[in-house]
Amino acid sequence: MVKKSDIYVLSGLLVHEGDWSYRSFADRLHVPHPVVQRGLSRAQDADLYSAEQREVHLPHFEEFAIHALRFVAPAQLGALMPGVPAAWAAEPMASAIRSSGAEPPPVWPYARGQVRGQAIEPLHPAAPEAVEEWPEFGELLALLDSLRAGDPRVRRVAEDLLVSLLSEWAGERKR
């Protein structure tokens, strides 16, 4: 059974460029290396990852993210607290969705966060720290959070952006 932390690991792998070891990749994600090893093992069992090619199966990841993620890893908006903008409050969703500003933005709770908003649990507690150093990773996680917690309109926009992004990455892999 795929866990939220496994999707976090796969998402990082999608964005990561170049060679990696379990330990170096875990450091980049701000998680212990067994989280990466176990996550990729479960992802391989679910046909989301190929250990032989050391890459995420893009069509399977896309299908899982769009159709299953919100059921496997649902997210609810919670209490007001400081944090890092998440879901539709973070790029690329923030540019694609116009907010009325009446509702507080979704945030990942984070002591050093600069935005006060409604808490949303990230796919992994290390996400706020990891995206400070890795903005591209944060963009993918924002799309996934929008699929997990957004209303139908937000989910449609996130789906379109995710499909476009994954298609772009698939084209780059073929080169």
Locations of regions flagged by a protein language model:
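Accessory beta->alpha helical hairpin/"wing" motif in late/C-terminal subdomains of nucleic-acid enzymes
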Residues: 53-67
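Short alpha-helical segments that sit at the start of domains
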Residues: 1-12, 16
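Helix-turn-helix DNA-binding helix
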Residues: 36-37
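Long, low-complexity, charge-rich intrinsically disordered regions
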Residues: 77-175
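A short, conserved structural fragment
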Residues: 44-55
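DNA major-groove recognition helix of helix-turn-helix
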Residues: 40
